Amino acid sequence: MRIPRLKLVEIMEVNGVKVFFHWSVLLIGALILLGAMEDPRIAFTVLAAYYGVILIHECGHMIAAQRKGCSVSSIVLYPIWGITCFSDPYSRYDHCVIAWGGVAAQAIVAVPLIAWVEIFGYTRFPPVNAALAILGFFSLSTGAFNLLPIRPLDGSIAWRLLPALLKRRPTRPIKREPAWRSWR
């Protein structure tokens, strides 16, 4: 799937893959920061953490796709979702693994942060607390939401993993020798 680059702003490169923002992300971010005159540090932290969650999710897809031998052309971040553009996977199983990659990446980041907050509590620094809440609790809840088996969410593909795993099993069981013969 090719995305027209006219309305995109390149922001970085991750593992050889260009990452773009849609222009609306910058506009919405600027409007939120303008409206947050009381404490712009918290507003900036929340925005950065929010788009960090989307980037972490898309990087999870990117890593899974690259591990499965797909070429990844770009990652595009929109105000409420992201898209990782990669070549067609070799199999249905590979496509399911790539779908799980985004949620797995979110969980790898979120679970330790949630454990930290549950064990030690929040800090006395409001911007750090905002980052912990977004990258931890919010990220895990959006990851769970993303696993709903509804298009266009990842769950519509990810939950096909079990049937794909069963299909990969050999049709005939491997023939084994009886245990009493194997001692020779």
Descriptions of predicted regions:
Residues 1-184:
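Hydrophobic transmembrane alpha-helices and their immediate loop junctions
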